[in-house]
A protein has these predicted regions:
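Structural recognition of an alpha-helix C-terminal capping motif at a helix-to-coil junction
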Residues: 54-61, 76-88
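Conserved RNAP core-binding helix
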Residues: 8-9, 27-28, 47-69, 183
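A short, charge-rich alpha-helical start-of-domain segment used by transcription regulators
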Residues: 2, 6, 14-39
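Arg/Lys-rich amphipathic alpha helix in sigma70-family domain 2
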Residues: 69, 87-108, 112-116, 140, ...
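Amphipathic alpha-helical segment used for protein-protein interaction
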Residues: 34, 113-160, 170
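Short, small-hydrophobic-rich alpha-helical interface motif
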Residues: 15, 34, 38, 55-63, ...
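Hydrophobic-face residues of short alpha-helical interaction/recognition segments
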Residues: 34, 38, 42, 63, ...
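DNA-recognition helix of helix-turn-helix
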Residues: 147-150, 158, 164-167, 172-203
Length: 210
Protein backbone atom coordinates (compact mmCIF):
# COMPACT_ATOMS: atom_id res chain seq x y z
CA UNK A 1 0.00 0.00 0.00
CA UNK A 2 1.28 3.44 -0.91
CA UNK A 3 2.19 5.54 2.13
CA UNK A 4 0.89 9.14 2.45
CA UNK A 5 4.45 10.46 2.34
CA UNK A 6 5.04 8.67 -0.97
CA UNK A 7 1.88 10.15 -2.48
CA UNK A 8 2.94 13.61 -1.27
CA UNK A 9 6.35 13.33 -2.92
CA UNK A 10 4.87 11.98 -6.15
CA UNK A 11 2.39 14.85 -6.46
CA UNK A 12 5.07 17.44 -5.80
CA UNK A 13 7.35 15.87 -8.40
CA UNK A 14 4.47 15.69 -10.87
CA UNK A 15 3.80 19.40 -10.39
CA UNK A 16 7.45 20.28 -10.88
CA UNK A 17 7.70 18.26 -14.07
CA UNK A 18 4.27 18.91 -15.57
CA UNK A 19 3.64 22.58 -14.90
CA UNK A 20 0.16 24.05 -15.36
CA UNK A 21 -1.18 20.93 -17.06
CA UNK A 22 -0.22 18.78 -14.08
CA UNK A 23 -1.73 21.32 -11.71
CA UNK A 24 -5.04 21.24 -13.58
CA UNK A 25 -5.07 17.43 -13.50
CA UNK A 26 -4.27 17.23 -9.79
CA UNK A 27 -6.80 19.89 -8.88
CA UNK A 28 -9.40 17.91 -10.82
CA UNK A 29 -8.49 14.77 -8.87
CA UNK A 30 -9.09 16.56 -5.56
CA UNK A 31 -12.05 18.63 -6.76
CA UNK A 32 -14.80 16.36 -5.43
CA UNK A 33 -13.39 16.54 -1.91
CA UNK A 34 -12.98 20.30 -2.13
CA UNK A 35 -16.53 20.67 -3.42
CA UNK A 36 -17.84 18.65 -0.47
CA UNK A 37 -16.01 20.97 1.93
CA UNK A 38 -17.53 24.08 0.35
CA UNK A 39 -21.02 22.57 0.26
CA UNK A 40 -20.85 21.70 3.93
CA UNK A 41 -19.31 24.94 5.19
CA UNK A 42 -21.08 27.50 3.01
CA UNK A 43 -23.37 29.61 5.18
CA UNK A 44 -27.02 28.73 4.35
CA UNK A 45 -27.82 32.44 4.07
CA UNK A 46 -25.62 32.57 1.00
CA UNK A 47 -27.43 29.79 -0.86
CA UNK A 48 -28.62 31.27 -4.14
CA UNK A 49 -26.13 34.13 -3.85
CA UNK A 50 -22.91 32.13 -4.02
CA UNK A 51 -22.32 29.10 -6.20
CA UNK A 52 -19.97 26.31 -5.13
CA UNK A 53 -18.39 26.25 -8.57
CA UNK A 54 -17.53 29.95 -8.27
CA UNK A 55 -15.70 29.30 -5.00
CA UNK A 56 -13.73 26.46 -6.57
CA UNK A 57 -12.90 28.52 -9.66
CA UNK A 58 -11.60 31.35 -7.50
CA UNK A 59 -9.64 28.85 -5.43
CA UNK A 60 -8.06 27.39 -8.56
CA UNK A 61 -6.97 30.82 -9.75
CA UNK A 62 -5.38 31.50 -6.36
CA UNK A 63 -3.71 28.07 -6.41
CA UNK A 64 -2.29 28.81 -9.86
CA UNK A 65 -0.94 32.14 -8.63
CA UNK A 66 0.72 30.66 -5.55
CA UNK A 67 1.83 27.24 -6.79
CA UNK A 68 5.50 28.19 -6.98
CA UNK A 69 5.46 29.24 -3.33
CA UNK A 70 4.13 25.79 -2.48
CA UNK A 71 6.73 24.01 -4.61
CA UNK A 72 9.51 26.04 -2.99
CA UNK A 73 8.44 24.68 0.39
CA UNK A 74 5.95 21.79 0.16
CA UNK A 75 5.65 21.29 3.91
CA UNK A 76 2.14 19.78 3.77
CA UNK A 77 0.48 17.35 1.33
CA UNK A 78 -0.99 18.96 -1.77
CA UNK A 79 -4.59 18.30 -0.78
CA UNK A 80 -4.12 19.99 2.60
CA UNK A 81 -2.65 23.04 0.84
CA UNK A 82 -5.52 23.11 -1.68
CA UNK A 83 -7.96 22.82 1.20
CA UNK A 84 -6.32 25.72 3.04
CA UNK A 85 -6.64 27.98 0.02
CA UNK A 86 -10.22 26.89 -0.68
CA UNK A 87 -11.15 27.57 2.94
CA UNK A 88 -9.54 31.01 2.79
CA UNK A 89 -11.55 31.83 -0.33
CA UNK A 90 -14.66 30.64 1.51
CA UNK A 91 -13.82 32.78 4.55
CA UNK A 92 -13.29 35.84 2.35
CA UNK A 93 -16.56 35.14 0.54
CA UNK A 94 -18.45 34.92 3.82
CA UNK A 95 -16.95 38.17 5.05
CA UNK A 96 -17.65 40.00 1.81
CA UNK A 97 -21.25 38.87 1.37
CA UNK A 98 -22.25 38.96 5.03
CA UNK A 99 -20.88 42.49 5.29
CA UNK A 100 -23.07 43.46 2.36
CA UNK A 101 -26.03 41.90 4.11
CA UNK A 102 -25.24 44.07 7.16
CA UNK A 103 -25.67 41.12 9.47
CA UNK A 104 -22.84 41.70 11.92
CA UNK A 105 -24.56 39.94 14.79
CA UNK A 106 -24.79 36.70 12.83
CA UNK A 107 -21.40 36.81 11.13
CA UNK A 108 -19.93 33.39 10.48
CA UNK A 109 -17.51 32.30 13.19
CA UNK A 110 -13.92 31.81 12.11
CA UNK A 111 -11.29 30.13 14.24
CA UNK A 112 -7.62 29.16 14.15
CA UNK A 113 -7.07 31.14 10.94
CA UNK A 114 -7.34 28.28 8.48
CA UNK A 115 -10.86 26.91 8.46
CA UNK A 116 -14.48 27.92 8.77
CA UNK A 117 -15.75 26.49 12.02
CA UNK A 118 -18.38 23.77 11.95
CA UNK A 119 -21.49 24.86 13.80
CA UNK A 120 -23.65 22.58 15.92
CA UNK A 121 -26.59 23.48 13.70
CA UNK A 122 -24.92 22.41 10.45
CA UNK A 123 -23.56 19.21 12.00
CA UNK A 124 -26.94 18.35 13.53
CA UNK A 125 -28.68 19.03 10.21
CA UNK A 126 -26.31 16.65 8.43
CA UNK A 127 -26.86 13.95 11.04
CA UNK A 128 -30.62 14.33 10.87
CA UNK A 129 -30.50 14.01 7.11
CA UNK A 130 -28.34 10.90 7.35
CA UNK A 131 -30.06 9.14 10.22
CA UNK A 132 -33.80 9.71 9.95
CA UNK A 133 -36.10 7.75 7.70
CA UNK A 134 -38.71 9.40 5.44
CA UNK A 135 -41.49 8.11 7.71
CA UNK A 136 -40.08 10.21 10.53
CA UNK A 137 -39.77 13.43 8.57
CA UNK A 138 -42.25 15.19 10.84
CA UNK A 139 -40.00 14.53 13.84
CA UNK A 140 -36.87 16.02 12.30
CA UNK A 141 -37.23 19.43 13.90
CA UNK A 142 -37.39 17.82 17.33
CA UNK A 143 -34.40 15.62 16.54
CA UNK A 144 -32.49 18.62 15.19
CA UNK A 145 -33.09 20.60 18.38
CA UNK A 146 -32.02 17.68 20.58
CA UNK A 147 -28.83 17.12 18.62
CA UNK A 148 -27.97 20.79 18.40
CA UNK A 149 -28.33 21.26 22.16
CA UNK A 150 -26.18 18.21 22.88
CA UNK A 151 -23.53 19.11 20.31
CA UNK A 152 -23.30 22.62 21.75
CA UNK A 153 -22.01 20.98 24.93
CA UNK A 154 -19.28 19.13 23.04
CA UNK A 155 -15.76 20.57 22.91
CA UNK A 156 -15.51 22.75 19.80
CA UNK A 157 -12.39 21.04 18.50
CA UNK A 158 -13.87 17.58 19.11
CA UNK A 159 -16.90 18.62 17.09
CA UNK A 160 -14.65 19.85 14.30
CA UNK A 161 -12.83 16.50 14.28
CA UNK A 162 -16.17 14.75 13.68
CA UNK A 163 -16.84 17.02 10.72
CA UNK A 164 -13.39 16.50 9.24
CA UNK A 165 -13.56 12.72 9.58
CA UNK A 166 -17.17 12.09 8.60
CA UNK A 167 -18.26 14.86 6.25
CA UNK A 168 -14.97 15.91 4.68
CA UNK A 169 -13.77 12.29 4.87
CA UNK A 170 -10.24 13.23 5.92
CA UNK A 171 -7.86 10.63 7.30
CA UNK A 172 -6.56 10.94 10.84
CA UNK A 173 -3.22 12.17 9.48
CA UNK A 174 -5.00 14.83 7.42
CA UNK A 175 -7.06 15.93 10.43
CA UNK A 176 -3.86 16.39 12.42
CA UNK A 177 -2.36 18.46 9.58
CA UNK A 178 -5.45 20.66 9.26
CA UNK A 179 -5.80 21.34 12.98
CA UNK A 180 -2.08 21.58 13.71
CA UNK A 181 -2.14 18.88 16.39
CA UNK A 182 -0.36 15.57 16.91
CA UNK A 183 -1.75 12.49 15.16
CA UNK A 184 -2.34 10.82 18.52
CA UNK A 185 -4.26 13.87 19.74
CA UNK A 186 -6.43 13.84 16.61
CA UNK A 187 -7.17 10.16 17.14
CA UNK A 188 -7.98 10.62 20.82
CA UNK A 189 -10.28 13.53 20.10
CA UNK A 190 -12.08 11.54 17.42
CA UNK A 191 -12.67 8.59 19.74
CA UNK A 192 -13.92 10.91 22.47
CA UNK A 193 -16.22 12.80 20.11
CA UNK A 194 -17.58 9.59 18.63
CA UNK A 195 -18.38 8.21 22.08
CA UNK A 196 -20.12 11.45 22.96
CA UNK A 197 -22.13 11.36 19.73
CA UNK A 198 -23.15 7.74 20.33
CA UNK A 199 -24.28 8.65 23.83
CA UNK A 200 -26.41 11.43 22.38
CA UNK A 201 -28.00 9.16 19.79
CA UNK A 202 -28.46 6.16 22.09
CA UNK A 203 -30.20 8.38 24.61
CA UNK A 204 -32.76 9.56 22.09
CA UNK A 205 -35.87 7.44 21.57
CA UNK A 206 -36.27 9.22 18.25
CA UNK A 207 -33.49 7.05 16.82
CA UNK A 208 -34.82 3.73 18.12
CA UNK A 209 -35.80 1.12 15.52
CA UNK A 210 -39.29 1.43 14.11
Amino acid sequence: MQQPEDSHREEVERLRMGGSEALAELFSIHQDRLERIVQYRLDPRLYGRVDVSDILQEAYLEVSRRIQDYLDQPSVPLFIWLRQITNQILIDTHRRHLAKMRDANQEVRIHRGNYVNASSLSLAAQLVGNLTSPSRAAMRDEILNQLRAALDEMDELDREVLVLRHFEELSNNEVAEVLGIQKSAASNRYVRALKRLRTILDGSSLFSPE
